[in-house]
From Swiss-Prot:
Keywords: Amino-acid biosynthesis, Aromatic amino acid biosynthesis, NAD, Oxidoreductase. GO terms for biological process: amino acid biosynthetic process; aromatic amino acid family biosynthetic process. Its EC number is 1.4.1.24. It is an enzyme of class 1 (oxidoreductase). This is 3-dehydroquinate synthase. Coiled coil: none annotated. The keyword Magnesium does not apply. Belongs to the archaeal-type DHQ synthase family. It comes from Korarchaeum cryptofilum (strain OPF8). It comes from the Archaea. Pfam families: DHQS. Catalyzes the oxidative deamination and cyclization of 2-amino-3,7-dideoxy-D-threo-hept-6-ulosonic acid (ADH) to yield 3-dehydroquinate (DHQ), which is fed into the canonical shikimic pathway of aromatic amino acid biosynthesis.
Length: 334
């Protein structure tokens, strides 16, 4: 699944929204020269996507489609530069024609709203490479970030288990969602917010228990849990009504609501692992029904886990957290 870009159109968005978008990791596009200059006054220019109108060439070339002859021009030129498409009437059909001919890797489109953005990102199941969209307020910006998460998978990677150690009794949290979790779906949890383990849901059949397709036994109350917007929650904070991320083995993610957080005292096990020089750990309940996920998508129960086994993890570039939000500062967790 190739990555997609959701870019904020600065020309039609308040400066406060533009600044917040940058902090959330979204790019900003500017078409009007005065807007470009204003943004350069308080933003790093590298964060601004330069847009130039056809036939001038910028990071993105704005091209207006008025009729079939314009589609023909795009077919000829699309391999030479990245185009930002603006259509005065029909949007989907012209883009379908372009994507069918040249693919969507160098094609971007202007969307009027988030629903249209979602449609454009999925044209012919390939979709455009990115959408440029005006955002009016913080609520819209949050929804835009959710959409960006939906269409961009997390980069899960392989980690080698280095230690499995029983650590006595502790309080663990079962996160019961209001959704049915599919095979291969679970949640990302860990003792460090920058190194999270994929814990599979309890939707696997066993001789002794019925499956709980809505549940992830996420471990100790002190564990971090990945939530929408790139934020984390302590498991102790999760309760009915919280929103968390369900993550699949291929990195796809979706927001799900919590119907209940079930805290009970159980025997616990510490699992440590390393990946490309990074180290992390998690504390989970010691039981046959708590599975981690292997790189091939199969599962391994924590009761069967041993040093040398390989499991899937997510390692974040940003290490520090302030009330669950990633920040760029030094922090050491151990």
């Amino acid at each position: 699944m190739r990555s997609k870009e959701l870019i904020i159109l600065a020309d039609s968005s308040p400066d406060s929204v533009v600044e917040k978008a940058i902090k959330m990791g979204l790019k900003v596009a500017a078409v009007d020269q005065s807007v470009k200059e204003r943004l350069k006054g308080y933003l790093d220019p590298s964060l601004i996507v330069e847009v130039s109108e056809w036939p001038s060439e910028g990071e993105l070339t704005l091209f207006k489609i008025r009729g079939p002859e314009d589609v023909e021009i795009l077919r000829r030129e699309a391999n030479e530069r990245k185009f930002l498409i603006e259509s005065e009437s029909w949007k989907i059909i012209p883009l379908e024609n372009i994507i069918a001919e040249v693919g969507g890797e160098r094609i971007y489109a202007i969307a009027d709203d988030l629903e249209e953005a979602r449609s454009l990102l999925g044209v012919l199941e390939i979709g455009v490479k990115g959408v440029v969209i005006p955002i009016k307020d913080s609520a819209q910006l949050e929804r835009a970030l959710r959409l960006s998460e939906e269409v961009n998978p997390l980069n899960l990677r392989e980690a080698r288990v280095t230690e499995v150690k029983q650590v006595g009794m502790g309080d663990r949290v079962c996160v019961d969602t209001t959704s049915i979790l599919s095979k291969g779906e679970g949640m990302l949890v860990g003792g460090s917010a920058s190194f999270l383990f994929l814990v599979h849901s309890e939707n696997i059949e066993s001789p002794f228990t019925s499956p709980r397709e809505f549940r992830v036994n996420a471990g100790a109350v002190s564990n971090y849990l990945l939530a929408p917007g790139g934020k984390t929650l302590y498991l102790s904070e999760v309760r009915a009504g919280s929103e968390v991320l369900a993550v699949s083995v291929d990195g796809r993610r979706r927001a799900v609501s919590v119907g209940r957080a079930k805290v009970e005292r159980r025997p616990m096990v510490l699992v440590r692992a390393s990946s490309d020089g990074e180290e992390g750990w998690t504390v989970l309940q010691l039981a046959e029904t708590i599975p981690l996920v292997k790189p091939d998508g199969s599962t391994v129960a924590v009761t069967d886990l041993k040093p040398g086994d390989r499991v899937l993890v997510y390692v974040s570039e940003r290490k520090a957290r302030h009330f669950g939000t990633a920040v760029d500062e030094f922090i050491e967790e151990r």
